[in-house]
Regions:
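Conserved beta-strand-loop-alpha-helix junction that forms the acyl-donor binding cleft
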Residues: 125-135
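Conserved G/P- and acidic residue-centered "switch" motifs that form tight phosphate/ATP-binding loops
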Residues: 70, 102, 131
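Conserved GNAT acetyl-CoA-binding A-motif
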Residues: 117-127
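Conserved catalytic-core motifs of GNAT/GCN5-like acyltransferases
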Residues: 126, 144-161
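A short, internal acetyl-CoA/4′-phosphopantetheine-binding micro-motif in the GNAT/acyltransferase core
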Residues: 66, 91-100, 128
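Conserved acetyl-CoA-binding loop-helix of GNAT-fold acetyltransferases
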Residues: 94, 100-113, 136-140
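GNAT-family acyltransferases
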Residues: 1-89, 158-169
Length: 169
């Protein structure tokens, strides 16, 4: 499937909200949930504006992964951009109907190519120990696992094991 990454903007709010609602249960199988409030359009709209502000301030850079028709099939982001140290953290999620098509792999390749334009020279990532698909995407894109730790999820209170990865550009 041909995809491209498109920088998040105001006009994407409705389509992104629908994408998040449609994939909520699927996402919550492998990553901590975002809480019920996130799935109210009012709250979502506020959060969307906060993300755009972060992006304006160059703290983060958010992208929608779209297919050739412009349909949102996933998200990929660089957050906690540190221009002094050249570091950022990557996160991504692919909609349920679009998994196992190589989309996360291709989107991460595209993001890695544009990261130097944001003065990022090292990308860090973390994923839960049971998210094998994400681990494979990271390794396939040249990330190395650098540590493992356990954290308590703020939303669910459950103990999760995280694998931490890094890639120098």
């Amino acid at each position: 499937m041909d995809i491209y990454i498109d920088r998040l903007n105001e006009r994407d709010a409705q389509a992104l909200f629908a994408y998040e609602c449609n994939n909520r249960r699927f996402f919550e199988q492998t990553v901590p949930g975002r809480g019920d409030d996130y799935y109210s359009f009012g709250t979502f709209g506020i959060r969307h504006k906060e993300l755009l502000k972060e992006q304006e301030e160059a703290i983060s850079s958010f992208y929608l992964i779209k297919d050739g028709s412009g349909i949102i099939v996933g998200r990929i982001n660089l957050v906690d951009i540190d221009p002094v140290n050249g570091t950022a953290h990557v996160g991504y999620r692919i909609g349920e109907a679009f998994t196992q098509k190589g989309i996360a792999n291709e989107a991460l390749k595209l993001l890695v190519k544009l990261a130097p334009d944001l003065n990022v020279t090292q990308i860090q990532a973390k994923t839960t120990s049971d998210n094998i698909a994400s681990q494979k995407v990271l390794v396939k894109n040249g990330f190395e696992r650098i540590s493992i730790n356990e954290e308590i999820s703020a939303d669910s209170g459950q103990k999760l094991t995280f694998f931490h990865y890094s890639r120098n550009l």
